[in-house]
């Protein structure tokens, strides 16, 4: 039996394989960019925010509801002490809250109270108030499936903006602030209520 000589891939075959790999890389890059730039969709956009009445994290004997927040816009920010992305965005959220453009309400989701309080003590508390939903039942009405998730609700109680994922300065400047400005300049908008110092 004679051994046939070993055949090496032809330059044409190598070029074809490289072309396919480049095409796959370009498609992946394009899909990732379109995913990053896709608008945040929520079935709640343009609709009344779901009713809620939840205990305050710092004093569970007190409750806060969406009717308590009516009359002025507020940002409802869903977070958990177990959420790495929440810790990453905390400095950005704190900086935004200091601007006092809108009330920032924390929504502690699927968390133990002790862990959440310790997390706020370590990383800072940018919130006017923090509600607690340890079982995550009320969050289901909002369509929350992950933290962090952020909603902007106008003074009439309508959900105007939704973002799933960590906030950064670019998202705040290019997505959140234009909608907030629209709310502030709307003839039917309630006057903005700023956070307490």
Curated annotation (Swiss-Prot):
Q: Which InterPro entries does the record associate with it?
A: Periplasmic_diS_OxRdtase_DsbE, Redoxin, Thioredoxin-like_sf, Thioredoxin_CS, Thioredoxin_domain, Thioredoxin_ResA/DsbE_sf
Q: Which domain of life is it from?
A: Bacteria
Please report any disulfide bonds recorded for this protein chain, giving both cysteine positions.
Answer: 83-86
Sequence ranges on the Periplasmic membrane side: 33-197
Gene3D superfamilies noted in UniProt: Glutaredoxin
Q: How does it sit in the membrane?
A: Single-pass membrane protein
The Gene Ontology biological process annotation of the record reads: cytochrome complex assembly
Thioredoxin domain sequence ranges: 43-181
Has UniProt tagged this entry with the keyword Ubl conjugation?
no
Keyword tags? Cell inner membrane, Cell membrane, Cytochrome c-type biogenesis, Disulfide bond, Membrane, Redox-active center, Transmembrane, Transmembrane helix
- CDD domains registered for this protein in UniProt: TlpA_like_DsbE
Give the main location.
membrane
Q: Which family does it belong to?
A: Belongs to the thioredoxin family. DsbE subfamily.
> What is the protein name given in its UniProt record?
Thiol:disulfide interchange protein DsbE
Protein source organism? Xylella fastidiosa (strain 9a5c)
